[in-house]
Swiss-Prot record:
This is Octanoyltransferase. In the reaction, the free carboxyl group of octanoic acid is attached via an amide linkage to the epsilon-amino group of a specific lysine residue of lipoyl domains of lipoate-dependent enzymes. Substrate binds at residues 70-77, 163-165, 176-178. Catalyzes the transfer of endogenously produced octanoic acid from octanoyl-acyl-carrier-protein onto the lipoyl domains of lipoate-dependent enzymes. Lipoyl-ACP can also act as a substrate although octanoyl-ACP is likely to be the physiological substrate. Its EC number is 2.3.1.181. Keywords: Acyltransferase, Cytoplasm, Transferase. GO terms for molecular function: lipoyl(octanoyl) transferase activity. Residues 31-230 form the BPL/LPL catalytic domain. Pathway: Protein modification; protein lipoylation via endogenous pathway; protein N(6)-(lipoyl)lysine from octanoyl-[acyl-carrier-protein]: step 1/2. Its main location: cytoplasm. It is found in: Cytoplasm. InterPro entries: aa-tRNA-synth_II/BPL/LPL, BPL_LPL_catalytic, Octanoyltransferase, Octanoyltransferase_CS. It comes from Albidiferax ferrireducens (strain ATCC BAA-621 / DSM 15236 / T118).
Length: 230
């Protein structure tokens, strides 16, 4: 089923105005408001989720730190990263937050497939990961999702390539997903990404994929439109 999802390419915009615009849009929407998908990239910024702890940001330097109302802990946004914000009415879509997370992750996985990369889920740690030794490997991870209930997720041999942070208000979503394309990854060394010490962050460039921001943004937008459809 095709989804009536209005897609907007916002280019490079500061994080705070985008965050404020999402809040305004969500607060003002009615049951008839069309769903939207905002795609952009941000200048360097750290964002803290509701579970964020100050000790996970140990050397921000000149990069601003913005407290947000999304789930999760600290992450980094910067040039060379595709950020997608689906603004959906989940009640109208007909599924709940757990399935929504799964669908976003599936859209990222399907985007990576287009570049010969296999994305993996890790139980208890939303986001998408790749094997550092063989990014195209389809072999099942020992951290596979079927092994649920792990108190301390294992990231051995993995690099995180996409991060999720979401908020649902009155059954309507905002915030979203960030997929790393070709970034300066050094700012990740100044934080514990998503609250995990030692978690390695990668981008497509790091694992040998040469892809432009526009190409990845278009593909991710297409996949999100498809996999978020009712």
């Amino acid at each position: 089923m095709a989804m009536d999802l209005l897609r907007h390419r916002l280019g490079r915009i500061d994080y705070l105005p985008a965050y404020e615009a999402m809040q305004v849009f969500t607060a003002a929407r009615t049951p008839e408001t069309p769903d939207e998908l905002w795609i952009c990239e941000h200048p360097p910024v750290y964002t803290q989720g509701l579970a964020g702890k100050a000790e996970h940001v140990f050397n921000p330097g000149t990069i601003p730190v913005v407290q947000t109302n999304r789930g999760g802990q600290v992450t980094y946004h910067g040039p060379g990263q595709v950020v997608a914000y689906p603004l959906l009415d989940l009640k109208r879509a007909g599924y709940f937050i757990k399935e929504y997370v799964y669908r976003i992750e599936e859209a990222v996985i399907r985007t990576l497939v287009e570049f010969g990369v296999t994305g993996h889920r890790v139980a208890g740690a939303p986001g998408i990961y790749v094997r550092l030794d063989d990014p195209g490997s389809h072999a099942l991870l020992p951290q596979r999702p079927m092994k649920s209930g792990l108190a301390n997720p294992s990231f051995g041999g993995l690099g995180k390539i996409a991060a999720l942070g979401l908020k649902v208000s009155r059954n309507c979503t905002y915030h979203g997903v960030a997929l790393n394309v070709a970034m300066d990854l050094e700012p990740y060394t100044r934080i514990n990404p998503c609250g995990y010490a030692g978690l390695q962050t990668v981008d497509l460039s790091t694992i040998g994929v040469c892809a432009g921001w526009d190409e990845v943004a278009e593909l991710l937008g297409d996949k999100l439109t498809r996999y978020l459809a009712p």
